[in-house]
């Protein structure tokens, strides 16, 4: 049953995710940012859920490159592709850090929590430290743990249907407005 309080693109996305089943692509999204040198940067991150009606939640390490990128330019784009429905969603918006992230930390497994205490992303691994990837328990919230809130301004959906592809654009002003556009 459709949730009338959600934007219509959320219904389409929910349908795509349901058809995708337990595939990793159901949670893996591609996040594009712009570096301090004004160069594009792209990486795969994990979709962690929704904040309010139309903001995505992403976890990251405070020491990662993307934190610097987002501080200098909060504009970002997320691409989410579903193979079974041949649907490509492009989300444009701004990313900000959520200051109240304790509840999200509490949802993580001990294995996941341990990873926030490992070495900095992109640094050479110190093999002399045996406990570098040790799984610990009862860990306090790491200062490296960051919850990002991706506030979506527009959604571009391309359905690779045959014989004709379909494309829709939603833009948020006071409310979400949907327009069918040429693929």
Residue ranges, per PLM feature:
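An N-terminal domain-cap segment
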Residues: 1-53, 68-69
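Charged, gly/pro-rich active-site loop segments
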Residues: 2-4, 87-183
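A short, aromatic/hydrophobic, helix- or strand-capping loop or linear motif
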Residues: 24-25, 81-82, 118-120
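Short beta-strand or tight-loop elements
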Residues: 27-29, 43, 74, 143-146, ...
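Short acidic, glycine-rich loop/turn motifs
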Residues: 33-37, 80-84, 159-162, 172
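Structured loops at beta-to-helix junctions and adjacent beta-edge loops in soluble globular domains
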Residues: 34, 61, 81, 94, ...
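A short mixed-secondary-structure module that forms the rim of ligand-binding clefts
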Residues: 48-86
């Amino acid at each position: 049953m459709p949730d009338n309080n959600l934007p219509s693109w959320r219904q389409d996305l929910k349908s795509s995710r349901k058809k995708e089943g337990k595939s990793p692509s159901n949670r893996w999204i591609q996040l594009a940012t712009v570096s301090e040198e004004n160069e594009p940067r792209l990486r795969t991150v994990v979709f962690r859920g929704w904040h309010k009606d139309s903001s995505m939640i992403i976890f990251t390490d405070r020491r990662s490159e993307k934190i610097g990128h987002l501080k200098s330019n909060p504009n970002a784009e997320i691409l989410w592709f579903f193979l079974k429905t041949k649907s490509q969603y492009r989300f444009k918006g701004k990313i900000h850090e959520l200051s109240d992230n304790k509840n999200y930390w509490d949802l993580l497994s001990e294995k996941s929590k341990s990873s926030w205490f490992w070495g900095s992303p992109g640094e050479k691994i110190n093999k002399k430290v045996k406990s570098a990837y040790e799984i610990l328990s009862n860990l306090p919230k790491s200062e490296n743990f960051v919850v990002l809130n991706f506030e979506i301004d527009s959604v571009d959906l391309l359905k690779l249907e045959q014989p004709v592809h379909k494309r829709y654009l939603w833009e948020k002003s006071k409310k979400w407005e949907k327009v069918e556009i040429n693929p």
